[in-house]
């Protein structure tokens, strides 16, 4: 066997013989690698932890990693029941990645109280998305100088009332296009049409009317977003030394889709930059700045007085960055909400309540959606929030990396231990969001979709003094038991915008369409913990006669 291996190596390197010295050197390298990895700080730490999903078998951790492809949620739930409920952290293996240290639910206040210099979130995001390879230097810059996200936080959230009409107009146009106006049932692909509706409607706010109605931009911005996430996984699986060599080939499609989007955006951006410059020079210039994120990015770029920021390629990259963070999560959340609502045994009752609420609120606001009107859609809000709990997209939350050179500590050594758990730098930590969302101690009947779970209290006290004193729980309310948007100071800043758009979508859908009741046997697809609707699932829809 050994001679056969040597012969293959000889053939590979083009040598006729391998000297004993080379063989000895290779042997020493292998042994040294084994010893160093076996006795490093990280190895000692992981060897001291309890593991979930690891069985007594040959190559136990390697085989456990492979099982995480389709079974990581069950492994997480097993660890939650076996360790978290005893206030003990546990290790969770992941395919092609370092393991996670999963902290118990009780550690969330501790985790949130720690400074960014002790545990860091940005490193995790960079590690997951591999911006250096997947989005290139432009993508790296828009992450380091996140003008687009600052605008989403400051401008969009503040100007939501002014954006509702434009969004609703685009919502009507895209629903009519992709779901049709036929009053007889016809089949549509749920995931595909939801994605296209969301992409067009959100880009009315992001990129403006002209770009959001360009089929090329809509298609290739969608493919770009999908490619960044998918190709990041492939790049992460490469040995670090091979990434600079192979990543450019893997991520070629990202650059192709970005360049097609640039060709669509280029004339629009150039025209806007010219008009904005003229308006800044002469307030009487006859041009009204559009009300959208693209325009606010251009204005902020002028304010920074940096020519690089006004490069159309840079501005297009910022639009694609917004699409990446917003489109996928929003369209999957909406597809899950539709699935959960229409496959529920109580769907008829839920729909009666939702339609009654929409009609009442719309009538009270003069037949137009307003910011205050959307805030009054407590049943619509609850339905989406419950779907985000019941069909949560991710399996972990509050992901951080320990960056303090001295490490950090958590009270997570078990209920019978008074000594804290010391975690060395470089270890990735998280909390088991999926298991928390399914904990019967936190949510009664957690495996049942209850559309009005979060609106019952507000409905009960509507219009009374008690309503004023009751804490208002909505989609955007993050808690230690509702974690789709994270929690604490790093909770998703775009959730206020996302919540309003999802409420408008669901309100529009239930008012204007009937969806044929779905089978309770329809299951979501789960891949390495991420839940997605079945990409091939078709549903029957028809326009309501109203």
Swiss-Prot record:
InterPro entries xref list: Cyt_P450 (IPR001128), Cyt_P450_CS (IPR017972), Cyt_P450_E_grp-IV (IPR002403), Cyt_P450_sf (IPR036396)
Pfam families: p450 (PF00067)
Cofactor(s) demanded: heme
GO biological processes: secondary metabolic process
Pathway: Mycotoxin biosynthesis
EC number of this enzyme: 1.-.-.-
Gene Ontology MF annotations: heme binding; iron ion binding; monooxygenase activity; oxidoreductase activity, acting on paired donors, with incorporation or reduction of molecular oxygen
Name of the protein described by the UniProt record: Cytochrome P450 monooxygenase gloP
Organism whose genome encodes this protein: Glarea lozoyensis (strain ATCC 20868 / MF5171)
């Amino acid at each position: 066997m050994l001679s056969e291996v040597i012969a293959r190596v000889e053939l590979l390197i083009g040598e006729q013989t391998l000297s004993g010295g080379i063989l000895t050197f290779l042997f020493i390298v292998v042994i040294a690698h084994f010893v160093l990895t076996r006795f490093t700080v990280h190895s000692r730490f992981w060897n001291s932890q309890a593991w979930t999903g690891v069985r007594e078998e040959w190559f136990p951790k390697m085989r456990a990693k492979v099982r995480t492809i389709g079974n990581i949620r069950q492994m997480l739930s097993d660890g939650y029941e076996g360790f978290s409920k005893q206030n003990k952290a546990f290790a969770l293996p992941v395919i092609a990645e370092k393991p996670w240290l999963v902290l118990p639910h009780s550690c969330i206040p501790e985790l949130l109280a720690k400074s960014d210099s002790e545990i860091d979130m940005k490193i995790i995001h960079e590690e997951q998305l591999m911006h250096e390879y997947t989005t290139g230097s432009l993508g790296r810059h828009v992450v380091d100088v996140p003008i687009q996200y600052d605008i989403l936080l400051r401008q969009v959230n503040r100007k939501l009332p002014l954006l509702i009409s434009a969004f609703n107009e685009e919502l009507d146009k895209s629903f009519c296009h992709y779901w049709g106006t036929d009053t007889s049932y016809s089949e549509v692909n749920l995931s595909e049409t939801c994605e296209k509706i969301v992409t067009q409607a959100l880009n009315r706010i992001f990129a403006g009317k002209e770009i959001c109605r360009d089929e090329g931009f809509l298609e290739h911005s969608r493919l770009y977003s999908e490619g960044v996430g998918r190709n990041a996984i492939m790049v992460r699986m490469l040995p670090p030394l091979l990434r600079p060599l192979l990543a450019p080939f893997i991520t070629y499609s990202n650059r192709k889709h970005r360049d097609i989007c640039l060709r669509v955006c280029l004339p629009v951006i150039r025209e806007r930059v010219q008009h904005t410059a003229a308006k800044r020079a002469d307030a009487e210039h006859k041009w009204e700045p559009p009300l959208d994120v693209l325009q606010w990015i251009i204005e902020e770029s002028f304010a920074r007085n940096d020519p690089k920021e006004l490069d159309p390629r840079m501005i297009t990259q910022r639009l694609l960055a917004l699409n990446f963070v917003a489109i996928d999560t929003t369209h999957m959340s909406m597809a899950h909400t539709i699935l959960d609502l229409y496959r529920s045994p109580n769907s008829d009752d839920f729909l009666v309540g939702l339609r009654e609420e929409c009609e009442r609120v719309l009538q009270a606001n003069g037949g137009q959606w307003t910011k205050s009107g959307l805030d009054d859609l407590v049943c619509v809000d609850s339905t989406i929030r419950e779907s985000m709990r019941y069909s949560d997209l991710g399996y972990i939350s509050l992901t951080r990396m320990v960056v303090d050179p001295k490490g950090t500590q958590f009270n997570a050594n078990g209920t019978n231990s008074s000594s804290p758990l010391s975690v060395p730098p470089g270890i990735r930590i998280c909390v088991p969001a999926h298991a928390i969302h399914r904990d019967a101690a936190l949510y009664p009947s957690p495996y049942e979709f209850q559309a009005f779970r979060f609106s019952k209290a507000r409905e009960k006290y509507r219009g009374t003094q008690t309503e004023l004193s009751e804490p208002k729980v909505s989609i955007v309310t993050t808690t230690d038991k509702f974690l789709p948007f994270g929690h604490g100071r790093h909770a998703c800043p775009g959730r206020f915008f996302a919540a309003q758009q999802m409420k408008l979508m669901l309100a529009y859908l239930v008012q204007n369409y009937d969806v044929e009741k779905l089978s309770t046997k329809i299951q979501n697809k789960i891949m390495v913990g991420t839940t997605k609707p079945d990409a091939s699932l078709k549903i029957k829809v028809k326009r309501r006669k109203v």
